[in-house]
From Swiss-Prot:
This is NADH-quinone oxidoreductase subunit I 1. Its cofactor is [4Fe-4S] cluster. It is found in: Cell inner membrane. Belongs to the complex I 23 kDa subunit family. GO terms for molecular function: 4 iron, 4 sulfur cluster binding; iron ion binding; NADH:ubiquinone reductase (non-electrogenic) activity; quinone binding. [4Fe-4S] cluster 2 binds at residues 73, 103, 106, 109. It catalyses: a quinone + NADH + 5 H(+)(in) = a quinol + NAD(+) + 4 H(+)(out). It comes from the Bacteria.
Amino acid sequence: MASLSSSINSLFLKEFFGAFFLSMRYFFRQKATINYPFEKGPVSPRFRGEHALRRYPNGEERCIACKLCEAICPAQAITIEAGPRRNDGTRRTVRYDIDMVKCIYCGFCQEACPVDAIVEGPNFEFATETREELYFDKARLLDNGDRWEREIARNIAIDSPYR
């Protein structure tokens, strides 16, 4: 009985036609592939990309040198040096470095920050030729924040109900 069923299936090419109709069903659908360098797919507001330090609207940097991001970083990729207290009692950072080679993009630094100073922005295209270029200092992080501020603020506003 098994050989009869096997010969009927092979006679009528059951597997071939099943595979053919399956491939035809997907052949006429819209393609899922995009031409990457020229087209970019949608990025989630929660995407964790290149790090950035944000500023207040008046231009002052947000980081208050509380060092919570440095303490919570599981990869120990963040190094902060706090400056002396100012006349108004606040502190600012003198040095803020992130070693992006060590970073695991977990987002803990962003969640720990009480003033939303350090964020992971929408940029995922920051490939470099040397490892030294992946050592971000304060100036580079502030430049990233200035460059991506509009998108970062929009993403934080979209994600705010879930924080």
